[in-house]
Design a protein with these regions (language model features):
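Class I SAM-dependent transferase core
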Residues: 1-57
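S-adenosylmethionine/decaboxylated-SAM
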Residues: 38-207
Length: 207
């Protein structure tokens, strides 16, 4: 187990962030916002590149950390949703600093439960779900509706620092995340994979 932990730490430390993303991460910490790890961000960037995704949705803008990784692929447009307007204001500035052209990143302020139903069905290739774990199952249902065939839903923080794997942990967010994993794994027409990178990623692909 010690070797695995050491290997995990080595992989996590192998990614060097650009100054803009690092600044967004530092600000997120000041806001108390949980960000994906650099290795996770790099993995997401790889997923979008390999899948050829051109249209993505993100639930949970934060200060823009994950979005900055997603838009490193110049062909991808991003719609990002969050209820926290102050953090989103900073995210807009970080996207601008990163060179995102006008119209490439659409930042929407509002609750995911209100915004997701307004987005067009089967119009996106990639969705990153990084919102409130207590709302994740309902959000995931809407996110799957948005995806085209072959599209990919990625749920961030799917292991919650290892708490999801500990049967003794019964906090609300842990139980909700376990239920989401079970729900998606039992949903017909999708293939799932739980990846132990960063804080965990749950991948669900539309067959």
């Amino acid at each position: 187990m010690a070797d695995f932990v050491q290997a995990w730490a080595y992989a996590e430390e192998s990614v060097v962030e650009d100054p803009i993303t690092a600044s967004a991460r530092d600000l997120a910490a000041e806001f108390g916002i949980r960000s994906i790890s650099p290795a996770t961000g790099n993995f997401l960037r790889m997923l979008t590149a390999l899948s050829g995704a051109t249209a993505a949705v993100e639930v949970g803008t934060g200060t823009g950390v994950s979005g900055l990784y997603l838009i490193q692929d110049s062909s991808l447009t991003l719609t990002t949703i969050d209820i926290e307007s102050e953090a989103q204001h900073h995210a807009r500035e970080f996207f601008r600093q990163a060179g995102a052209r006008a119209g490439r990143v659409r930042v929407i302020n509002g609750a995911s439960a209100d915004i997701l139903p307004r987005l067009a069905t089967s119009s996106y290739d990639f969705v990153l779900l990084d919102g409130d774990p207590l709302e994740a199952e309902g959000d995931a249902t809407e996110c799957l509706r948005l995806l085209r065939r072959g599209g990919l839903l990625v749920v961030a923080h799917a292991l919650l620092g290892g708490k999801v794997a500990d049967p003794a942990r019964r906090e609300d967010d842990v139980v909700a995340t376990r239920n989401l994993i079970k729900h998606l794994s039992r949903t017909e027409g999708i293939t799932t994979s739980l990846v132990p990178i960063g804080d965990g990623l749950l991948l669900a692909r539309i067959d």
